[in-house]
């Protein structure tokens, strides 16, 4: 049986991979492990707008209450809200039902501990082991069975918290917001209007059939069009559960996670709030991002792909900002997970405070051309490039040739018999040739 938990909880096609039975079992096992067998644990449960959300919430809630948990249902709400509300309500755990940026047929179940952090691998393994080994858990009866309560003030609690993460307001700003028909629909329109912005909305109803369909952070084309048509200052695109943000400048250009992190890190440094003068990002962040930070005297630490690895490094080193090119950005002084709304507020606030358009702010970084080529290799040899002296020597030669203005990244595919060869640098034709020759060398040596 394959591992249930991936890099972001349990995810799959709802009612096929992620069945109500599995949701029930996750509820039972998750509540038991996270609350250390406490008799009456408290668990916050939220969801995005997917049509399978009701089905899975009912099953999950049945599982949680069957081991005696008190369920606090907070309805359709962003993933980072569940992390925050778990702390605010002093709950023992939080659970979010969402598949983030994935298509509508998918859904997922993601757990948070009592402090609002995603679970480490070893805790997920314990939950998974209970399910796979069919370990018997307590089944209380009578008054020992848990109950479910709806907290109707949760959205207001989260909105007030979000407002506290910036100084001042957003008056005189014209902002287009794309909520991807997802969880941010219940928060972002109210939040930005209450802060005084003139708001133009797209995809701002929680319609499960439309979530992420040609909208949101993975499809910003409509947002780009609306920003230009309305003469807006900025466009903001969230994904289905609002843990990531992609922006659009006043000229209609996309501003990705690398640019947003660079803008925010430089601002934090100016204000003396960039802890340890360091930003954490993954190996996928562009070399242009690294160079932009270096020019400002800011250090960069890179991690494996996945916001959980970024967060682990941030908590270990006590850093204040980290994230991914995709727009998952963590402001650890404010929340314990990527938060699209916090990121949006910071970005808009910096633009207003500085009096600079987003295009001017984004000019702090130049995105270098990137070439990605897949080298086909035998599955069992995907990691052998690490030991091959000729391949290692060639990578060193290429990086030396680029003199700090480019880089080579080799990543074995997690699912296919491929090694991905990525080269970044100033000259597209040159790096294309480099990537092609390196991929050919890897194929020759590892087959």
Swiss-Prot record:
Entry binding sites for Mg(2+): 100, 239, 241, 243
EC number in record: 5.4.2.10
Modified residues (Phosphoserine): 100
Superkingdom of the organism of origin: Bacteria
Keyword Ion transport: no
Enzyme class: isomerase
Molecular-function GO terms, alphabetical: magnesium ion binding; phosphoglucosamine mutase activity; phosphomannomutase activity
One BP term from GO: carbohydrate metabolic process
Alphabetically ordered keywords of this record: Isomerase, Magnesium, Metal-binding, Phosphoprotein
Pfam families: PGM_PMM_I (PF02878), PGM_PMM_II (PF02879), PGM_PMM_III (PF02880), PGM_PMM_IV (PF00408)
Cofactors, names only: Mg(2+)
Cofactor binding notes: Binds 1 Mg(2+) ion per subunit.
Positions annotated as active site in the UniProt record: 100
Keyword Magnesium on entry: yes
Post-translational changes noted in the entry: Activated by phosphorylation.
Catalysed reaction equations from the record: alpha-D-glucosamine 1-phosphate = D-glucosamine 6-phosphate
Any Gene Ontology CC annotation: cytosol
Homology family: Belongs to the phosphohexose mutase family.
Function: Catalyzes the conversion of glucosamine-6-phosphate to glucosamine-1-phosphate.
PANTHER family the UniProt entry points to: PHOSPHOGLUCOMUTASE (ALPHA-D-GLUCOSE-1,6-BISPHOSPHATE-DEPENDENT) (PTHR42946:SF1), PHOSPHOHEXOSE MUTASE (PTHR42946)
Protein name (Swiss-Prot/TrEMBL): Phosphoglucosamine mutase
Organism this protein belongs to: Thermoanaerobacter pseudethanolicus (strain ATCC 33223 / 39E)
Lineage: Bacteria, Bacillati, Bacillota, Clostridia, Thermoanaerobacterales
Record gene name: glmM
């Amino acid at each position: 049986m394959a591992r249930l938990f991936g890099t972001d909880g349990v995810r799959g096609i709802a009612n096929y991979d992620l069945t109500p039975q599995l949701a029930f079992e996750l509820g039972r096992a998750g509540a038991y492990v996270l609350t250390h067998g406490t008799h009456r644990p408290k668990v916050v449960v939220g969801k995005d707008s997917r049509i399978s959300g009701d089905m899975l919430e009912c099953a999950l809630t049945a599982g949680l209450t069957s081991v005696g948990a008190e369920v606090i249902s907070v309805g359709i709400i962003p993933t980072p809200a569940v992390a925050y509300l778990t702390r605010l309500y002093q709950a023992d755990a939080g659970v979010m039902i969402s598949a983030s940026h994935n298509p509508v047929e998918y859904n997922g179940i993601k757990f948070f501990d009592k402090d609002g952090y995603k679970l480490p691998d070893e805790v997920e393994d314990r939950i998974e082991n209970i399910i796979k080994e069919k370990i018997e858990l307590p089944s209380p009866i009578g008054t020992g069975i848990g109950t479910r309560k709806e907290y109707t003030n949760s959205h207001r609690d989260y909105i007030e918290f979000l407002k506290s993460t910036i100084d001042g307001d957003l008056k005189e700003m014209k902002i287009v917001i794309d909520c991807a028909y997802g969880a941010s629909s219940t928060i972002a329109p109210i939040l930005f209007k209450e802060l005084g912005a003139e708001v133009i909305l797209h995809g701002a109803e929680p319609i499960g059939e439309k979530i992420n369909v040609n909208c949101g952070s993975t499809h910003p084309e409509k947002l780009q069009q609306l920003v230009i048509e309305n003469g807006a200052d900025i466009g903001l695109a969230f994904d289905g559960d609002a843990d990531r943000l992609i922006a659009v400048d006043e000229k209609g250009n996309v501003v990705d996670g690398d640019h947003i992190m660079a803008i925010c890190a430089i601002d934090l440094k100016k204000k003396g709030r960039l802890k340890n003068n360091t930003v954490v990002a993954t190996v996928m962040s562009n070399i242009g991002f690294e160079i932009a930070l270096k020019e400002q005297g800011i250090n960069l630490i890179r991690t494996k792909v996945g916001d959980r690895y970024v967060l682990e490094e941030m908590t270990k080193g006590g850093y204040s900002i980290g994230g991914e090119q995709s727009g998952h950005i963590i402001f650890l002084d404010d929340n314990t997970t990527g938060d699209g709304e916090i990121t949006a507020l910071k970005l808009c606030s910096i633009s207003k405070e500085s009096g600079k358009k987003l295009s001017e702010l984004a000019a702090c970084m130049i995105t270098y051309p990137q070439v990605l080529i897949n080298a086909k290799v035998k599955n069992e040899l995907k990691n052998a490039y690490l030991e091959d002296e000729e391949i290692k020597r060639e990578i060193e030669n290429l990086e030396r040739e680029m003199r700090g203005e480019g880089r080579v990244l080799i990543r074995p595919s997690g699912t296919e018999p491929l090694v991905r060869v990525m080269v970044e640098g100033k000259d597209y034709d040159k790096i294309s040739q480099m990537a092609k020759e390196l991929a050919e060398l890897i194929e020759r040596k590892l087959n």
